């Protein structure tokens, strides 16, 4: 058993320190370290690493608290949300953890490091620091009680349940495991599924003028989760005319024409399928559109289907030709 210790605060726990402790124990140096939960100053000072407690941030001394006055650390100069203990540990050790898990080179490690922060860790930083996702004067249409931070919160003892340290510490171990498995699941997804998709989308972007002279239609060599990559690659490559449609073969061997949203999380489309097509199917849709082999056009105009690649491409081209050139460009 290692003599190294990781100290975090006692009492109620949160998602950020649960993940911070788990991340540290992924590292060979700390994998056998003992987790101590205390607010006692002498215990904190004797610990090898202090996380989310102690009112000190000092990487050289392995002190990673963010609650103290004057703390302003962010992930980098492109991010303005202050780090939580999870963000601090990830900032310093995230690349090592990614390389250790996936055996990636430096450029891929950097790409995954940024992606995982933006898609997961930053949320923990925002929640723990009380940063709203949207202006407070906007009333939510429904309650959200199932986020990962909320699920960790639910592991705390209820007000009318025993607050015995042994019980609470056992619950904290569950919180660490919950956060750790969530982190590893996301890391594996981005490394093994999300990342390989990037080259497929990038290849379609490079060939877009061969697909259609407008450069506004992509055809994927195979289906993959393309949306995230499309928006980031458009920005990276400074593409002036936004992509309007992405075509791909579905699992039945038919083809889909998918309209692109104005951003990754919006249901508003850069260019929907024509209104007169929407909600129509099969021969009726083929008659209205003048395109053979039509299968369907969704009632909201965000996706359509055709039996052939050529038919799906014609659906995209006809939509482009019917649209005002100024639309969302």
Swiss-Prot record:
Highest classification ranks of the organism: Eukaryota, Amoebozoa, Evosea, Eumycetozoa, Dictyostelia
Protein name per UniProt: MYG1 protein
UniProt record similarity statement: Belongs to the MYG1 family.
One Pfam family per UniProt: MYG1_exonuc
Cellular component aspect of the GO annotation: cytoplasm; nucleus
